[in-house]
Amino acid sequence: GPMGIMGPRGPPGASGAPGPAGEPGEPGQTGPAGARGPPGPPGKAGEDGHPGKPGRPGERGVVGPQGARGFPGTPGIPGFKGIRGHNGIDGIKGQPGAPGVKGEPGAPGENGTPGQAGARGIPGERGRVGAPGPAGARGSDGSVGPVGPAGPIGSAGPPGFPGAPGPKGEIGPVGNPGPAGPAGPRGEVGIPGVSGPVGPPGNPGANGITGAKGAAGIPGVAGAPGIPGPRGIPGPVGAAGATGARGIVGEPGPAGSKGESGNKGEPGSAGPQGPPGPAGEEGKRGPNGEAGSTGPTGPPGIRGSRGIPGADGGSRGATGPAGVRGDSGRPGEPGIMGPRGFPGSPGNIGPAGKEGPVGIPGIDGRPGPTGPAGARGEPGNIGFPGPKGPTGDPGKNGDKGHAGIAGARGPAGPPGFQGIPGPAGTAGEVGKPGERGIPGEFGIPGPAGARGERGPPGESGAVGPAGPIGSRGPSGPPGPDGNKGEPGNIGAIGTAGPSGPSGIPGERGAAGIPGGKGEKGETGIRRGAPGAIGAPGPAGANGDRGEAGPAGPAGPAGPRGSPGERGEVGPAGPNGFAGPAGAAGQPGAKGERGTKGPKGENGPVGPTGPVGAAGPAGPNGPPGPAGSRGDGGPPGATGFPGAAGRTGPPGPAGITGPPGPPGAAGKEGIRGPRGDQGPVGRSGETGASGIPGFAGEKGPAGEPGTAGIPGTPGPQGIIGAPGIIGIPGSRGERGIPGVAGSIGEPGPIGIAGPPGARGPPGAVGNPGVNGAPGEAGRHGNRGEPGPAGSVGPAGAVGPRGPSGPQGIRGDKGEPGDKGPRGIPGIKGHNGIQGIPGIAGQHGDQGAPGAVGPAGPRGPAGPSGPAGKDGRIGHPGTVGPAGIRGSQGSQGPAGPPGPPGPPGPPGPS
């Protein structure tokens, strides 16, 4: 075994006691001389004798000679100055030691004096809405490009899905719409989800097939002209009818041109200084969290005072073992901004965060117009994927058909009795203008007049401004199942779309409570091994493009149904997940031009019917000129945070230099102007604590610098290899939040490419599983009544109609002010009161006329406020055609108008 260590010397032992003295023996006989025996034991020591007399002093000795003096030694040669030593090589990483005792929380630093608040800048004037540009001329169709070469044969595709179900049965007749269900309870507001990454935009779909022109309606039979009756006594003016139901909101108009960007406002004053918060506990480093959405930039905090410098440490000892990380502490409140620390070395590039979870899908977009159901195409076999051809030219729109013949007027009612004309009166003098009369009370509403004949369809009005987004309507009865189309192939990933417009900067938040002074972190590893660059994954092959089935013939036009009553809006269903983008369809064939029908003869002018009830609100007229820009409204609510931006390429890490010796405390010089805000660096790993320096003198606060112009984002580069981990630097001051950039102009739409070559037919795909039916929509609130329509052109003067029934006498109105004296009329003969005629029957409804040509395109509306960075959803699929509603009931007759001023008396 190993040699032991020699122990210390023990203490000496105690002395033994002397033995007793022996007695003298008797003298023996002298014997022969024997052999010398062993020495006996020592005898008893004798007692001291008496002292003798002192002797004589000795003689003085001779003094010896003096020795020679030694020579002085030579001084030693001074040694050379030693060479200054270099920093030693980093020691081997020590084993992790036991967790240290938790230290006392550090004392919070002194609150710095709040800086002087800057003057509030004058807000810039709002930008004006730009005038809409002129509509561009229709471009000519491009030539069809050559067909590209066939691509290489791809690998075998994945296994197919389960088989397709059998064909659907015959489509049954459309049922009558059921009664509207009761309004469901209002759902609770859900938790806003985390915005997911923006998916790649899908391929733009080709233009749909132009529908065939409908057949012209059968002209109605012209009725026999009635005998004109006598002019009846005008009845009381009916009261104004109730406001009709709001019309269907039109499709949104084209987006207006972008307005000029407003002037940048001055930065606001800093918020008040908050109290210092408690010191947070030192926590362990948790796992890398998932990348969250980028929050709004908070306001800069108030600059705090410089902390008390620590004592000058001695020589640096050996690096101890790294302690175990503590538990993750609760995040502290944002602290007051401290003084600018000493610049540190650039930190190493951290790993990229995990991709955030897929956010909750956005609200479904407005359903597009219902297109005609195409005939089911024959499924083809799955072929080898061919190369993706360029996009085809859009098909031309077919010519609009001519308007059909308007229906003939119905038969006139029986004529009324002829009244006897009275004698004509003499003309009176012109009266002077009287004062305005007091309006009389409304009389009893008269009987509703007969419904007027339906006029010919008017021309389509100009596209009105975009109306408010309507609430979701109730779920209608399920329509007939259409023929199942062949499965589409997955399209190639489209190119990235242009960047969305920048959102409106949010309001400036209040300064947060400053956090306490945190504990000193553990010493990190100074240098780590660089990670290896991952191998790039194999690129996926583009899927083959399926063959489009032939377009089915358009079905015959069904009978025109009567409009139904407006149903209540059901509760909003859950947001569905965005489906995959469908493959672009083939452009449809150009429809044949319809033949112009024969022009019918003008029918005889019928008698004038009684005054009808107030009709429904007319279509929205063309939008008026853009009004002057109003005052700025209140700031809008902060939108959902946009998707997290992609991490840019990390810069190369610099070589870490050796730490220098601590410098002496120098005097702080004159503070220079504040520079432009630099880019925010990535946080480095926690490095070893450096030697504390001497505290410098606190200087005066500098003037705040102007914020730099925000730069445009550069293209994403290739992620470089991780750099060498450097000594982390101290955290610098938080920069002033940058001003949001102006909204960029939308880029021009690219020219559509020629259609690609048709690939081989694919195999029959397996049908997908039918999705679960969605929940019924939430009942919405009744919309506000729409604006009154523009006055239509005056109709032709009809013949005198039969006298209507005598109205009920209204209540006597209050006497009005004296009206202006009227022009004396010719004295008429007193006629006898006519007998009320029999009300005529309603004429048959005329055949619906053909759709007129489209009206001119209205001017572009003003551009709305830019939203936050939203996600562009996939284009929604065309929904099934809804059942035409039944015709609305006739509105009540309006109350009679106020009586007119009395005329002047005739001459006697």
UniProtKB/Swiss-Prot annotation:
Pfam families: Collagen. It is found in: Secreted; Secreted, Extracellular space; Secreted, Extracellular space, Extracellular matrix. Residues 627-636 have a biased composition (Gly residues). GO terms for cellular component: collagen trimer; extracellular matrix; extracellular space. Type I collagen is a member of group I collagen (fibrillar forming collagen). It comes from Toxodon sp. This is Collagen alpha-2(I) chain. Residues 45-59, 590-599, 809-820 have a biased composition (Basic and acidic residues). GO terms for biological process: extracellular matrix organization. These protein fragments were extracted from fossils. The tryptic peptides required multiple purification steps in order to eliminate contaminants and to increase the concentration of peptidic material. GO terms for molecular function: extracellular matrix structural constituent conferring tensile strength. Residues 1-211, 227-908 are annotated as: Disordered. It comes from the Eukaryota. Residues 1-36, 129-158, 183-197, 234-249, 293-309, 403-418, 465-474, 526-542, 569-589, 602-617, 637-647, 701-730, 745-775, 785-805 have a biased composition (Low complexity).
